[in-house]
Amino acid sequence: MLDITLLRKDLASAVAGLEKRKKNQPYLDVSAFTALEAERKTLQTRTEEIQARRNALNKQIGPLKAKGEPVDALMAEVNALKAEQESQSARLDQIQPELQALLLAVPNLPHVSVPVGEDEAGNVEMRRWSPQGGAGANAAPLPFAAKDHVDLGAPLGLDFEMGAKLAGSRFTVMKGPIARLHRALAQFMLDIQTEKHGYAECYVPYIVNAATLSGTGQLPKFEGDLFAAKKGGQEGEPAPDHSALYLIPTSEVPLTNFVRDEVVAEAQLPIKLTAHTPCFRSEAGSAGRDTRGMIRQHQFDKVEMVQIVHPEKSYDALEQMTGHAEAVLQALELPYRVVLLCTGDMGFGATKTYDLEVWLPAQNTYREISSVSNCEAFQARRLQARFKNAQGKNELVHTLNGSGLAVGRTLVAVLENHQNEDGSINVPAALRPYLGGLELLRG
């Protein structure tokens, strides 16, 4: 959530920043905000005037009563002022949630270093890496026609028909060797993030309440992207209030909420958390996109990284976390590139985002495998997540999140990049300890 003080002081500047996101929509209802703010100021001024007048009258009434002089007229005025003040205060209490509702629908402001653009065409490649050539090198082509992960995975136990039978489209079943590979990848990622990069491993609920999703920005704007959960015996639709429950779209949601309504000591920062969880997304608006294979699923696994940091250190943390995701790709010998997202392609809560895109030979292109974002104080303001600074004052933290990595897409990349002409898969050296020393996967 944006700082309302910023909007009050320089609304035009904030609107100009929002317009850089280049989406054809009013991010902020300026007329509604301006009208509510004008009414709020008027009510607040009048309430203060009433209180001052009541205080003055009360000072007069006491001495007059002591002298036995009549105070009926003054008392009548005090009572009238009290009634008016209560009415004004009641309206003020109504305006605050109305302003809050407006602000909850407003995205974060892009950082000055973010390129302005309408969509992914405006993104800027920062660097690329390949196992054959290192930094700056393109992915080396395979010496034979590449098969895609669907054909490679089928003999290894990748079963889309069973997934459709059990749950519908965009679900997958994995059995045997490929299920083992999937598990090994998740364990490998967790070990890198905990043992090498210092994240604390966490186990979190896969179902969270609406307040938790509001804190990280998924609600109220993106409810259509979520799966709502209904308790057994519950009639009708889930309640539209904070008692409603949803499947998590990412473990960023519960992990970041660890600091909701908390004031942490400055010495505790940075707080670095990671978790391996399934993620559930309705993929609303994705009809017809990536219908073949595992690239876009309703349920997928991810190892998430979250950092809660001092505001002065969040951009250093962004670069660090991007490197933490890159380390997984390099260890798995997967070619990739790092892309700085433009204003029109960034997520709702982000002020700056790097995407890591892995090379998929069968598609002859790079595909997103991780997004790493700095949200500055945007989530922290919604969460009321603060730290006590050196002056003893409470200050909002900055929050960052990133995939380290999406397990299913990493599985796809391993299959396609490490395939042999006969369809067998070379197991990357870093993964072999997680597969009992196995060097080759065959159907």
UniProtKB/Swiss-Prot annotation:
Pathways involved: Aminoacyl-tRNA biosynthesis; selenocysteinyl-tRNA(Sec) biosynthesis; L-seryl-tRNA(Sec) from L-serine and tRNA(Sec): step 1/1
Glycosyltransferase listed as a keyword: no
- Please give the chief subcellular localization of this protein: cytoplasm
SUPFAM superfamilies named in the record: Class II aaRS and biotin synthetases, tRNA-binding arm
Compartments, record wording: Cytoplasm
- CDD domains given in the database record: SerRS_core
> Which residues of this UniProt protein bind ATP?
R281, S282, E283, E368, I369, S370, S371
Extract the PROSITE patterns matched here: AA_TRNA_LIGASE_II
Q: Which GO terms describe its cellular component?
A: cytoplasm
Q: Which reaction does it catalyse?
A: tRNA(Ser) + L-serine + ATP = L-seryl-tRNA(Ser) + AMP + diphosphate + H(+); tRNA(Sec) + L-serine + ATP = L-seryl-tRNA(Sec) + AMP + diphosphate + H(+)
What Gene Ontology molecular function terms does this protein carry?
Answer: ATP binding; serine-tRNA ligase activity
Q: Which domain of life is it from?
A: Bacteria
Q: Does the keyword Nucleus apply?
A: no
Q: Which InterPro entries match?
A: aa-tRNA-synt_IIb, aa-tRNA-synth_II, aa-tRNA-synth_II/BPL/LPL, Ser-tRNA-ligase_type_1, Ser-tRNA-synth_1_N, SerRS_1_N_sf, SerRS_core, tRNA-bd_arm
Positions with a binding annotation for L-serine: T250, S251, E252, E304, S403
Q: Name one GO biological process term.
A: seryl-tRNA aminoacylation
Alphabetic keyword roster: Aminoacyl-tRNA synthetase, ATP-binding, Cytoplasm, Ligase, Nucleotide-binding, Protein biosynthesis
Instruction: Quote the EC number.
Output: 6.1.1.11
Outline what the protein does: Catalyzes the attachment of serine to tRNA(Ser). Is also able to aminoacylate tRNA(Sec) with serine, to form the misacylated tRNA L-seryl-tRNA(Sec), which will be further converted into selenocysteinyl-tRNA(Sec).
Tell what the record comments on domains. Answer: Consists of two distinct domains, a catalytic core and a N-terminal extension that is involved in tRNA binding.
Quaternary context: Homodimer. The tRNA molecule binds across the dimer.
Q: Which protein family is named in the record?
A: Belongs to the class-II aminoacyl-tRNA synthetase family. Type-1 seryl-tRNA synthetase subfamily.
Please report the name of this protein according to its UniProt entry: Serine--tRNA ligase
Q: Which organism is it from?
A: Variovorax paradoxus (strain S110)
